[in-house]
Amino acid sequence: QRQMCIETDVKAARDKAGQISTVYTCCAEAFPNTFTFSDPAEAAWTVLHAVAGGYDGYLRWAVNSWTADPLRDSRFRTWAAGDTYSIYPGPRSSIRFERLVEGIQDCEKIRILREELTTKGAKGKLEKLNKTVAKITPEGLSETQESATQMVNEIHKLLNTL
């Protein structure tokens, strides 16, 4: 069985050996991703799915590998438009980058809430949080038929009520 990006037994062996396992997004994954044509919520989803899989971190391969004219054309060779950057030259962000930051903040909220709910013995709330987070995987997308946007909105609603 696969756990998102690697075989479940490989991930378990790495965990047992104390090795760090991170997840990486680049142009190989067509969906969800952070391309200029991607739904903005997919940027948050890509980070959240690292938490769902129990990974130690997330890496987006590039944020500022600009094309020749990044303000006008985000295409680079045969790669999907926007794959090489999510911020622009100068003091310019993008919706894609801001949603990526949002996903990172959500991951920290999840970490803090898990600690607090465990300390308080709030098992029901912790189970609800963990169940909602666990869906944020490629398998969860196909099993639930929910979009990345729906999953991100659901976790936001929960994080803001716990």
Language model regions located:
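Short, small-residue-biased leader/transition segments that mark boundaries at the very start
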Residues: 1-6
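Extracytoplasmic/secreted cell-surface and envelope-processing proteins
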Residues: 7-11, 30-34, 67-70
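Short amphipathic alpha-helical segments and helix-helix/interface helices
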Residues: 9-14, 46-47
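Active-site clefts of carbohydrate-active enzymes
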Residues: 16-45, 62
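Extracellular protease catalytic domains of secreted zymogens
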Residues: 36-38, 53, 61-62, 69, ...
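Conserved, mostly hydrophobic/aromatic
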Residues: 50
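Catalytic domains of carbohydrate-active enzymes that cleave complex glycans
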Residues: 55, 71-162
